[in-house]
Amino acid sequence: YCTRSWTIHSVPRLTKAKRLMEKLKELLNRECDRTMSSEEWDALFKLSTQIVLKKGDVLISPGDIEPDVYIVKEGIIRGVDFNGDQERTFCFGLPGTVFNSRFSFYRKLPSYYQIEACCRSVVLRIPREDYIAMTDECHSFAVWALHYAWYEQFLEEDRESTVHNGNAKERYIHMLKTRPAIANGVSQRIL
């Protein structure tokens, strides 16, 4: 028989949605050499709307002016450019990847690239004006965005020096070694 009165403190449990958002913040903080606090990421996410894409859905089409910024929350996104009827995958985006049409974002020009879902994917869409306003109003976000842009430049050169060199077998082996989630989650035709 127990006479002691016990107080039970409940430990708050994160819902699946909150766990997913915490994981997304962690991934974004690994995207470059600067990080932001959970609250700062929440401020950015509040500016976004969520878009659910099915495999093959096109988010940005060549010729469209689409200046907004996107963050991959779930799934795999790919960037495609065209030489006539021939398409070439030039990049993939996994959760935590930030992307946009650089032509549209910076100069309000039609997009050169096509951005599409490789599988069921969820992206967060942040209007360009809100993204720019946040860089004006939040120093830590502005620093993060600048370092992310520099990281994107690094990745572009890295892609040219590795992924776009060699024969198909060598490129596939490189993909298996460096980005197995893409090799396992995308059809072989796209790779």
Predicted regions, residues:
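Short, low-complexity, intrinsically disordered N-terminal modules
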Residues: V11-R13
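Cyclic nucleotide-binding regulatory module and flanking cytosolic helices
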Residues: K16-T49, S104
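Short, structured interface segments that constitute the first stable element of a domain
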Residues: L20-N29, E40, R107-E137
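Cyclic nucleotide-binding regulatory domains
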Residues: C32, D57-C119
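Generic detection of short hydrophobic beta-strand segments and adjacent strand-loop junctions
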Residues: I51-L53
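Polybasic "coupling" helices that flank or enter modular domains
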Residues: E116-L191
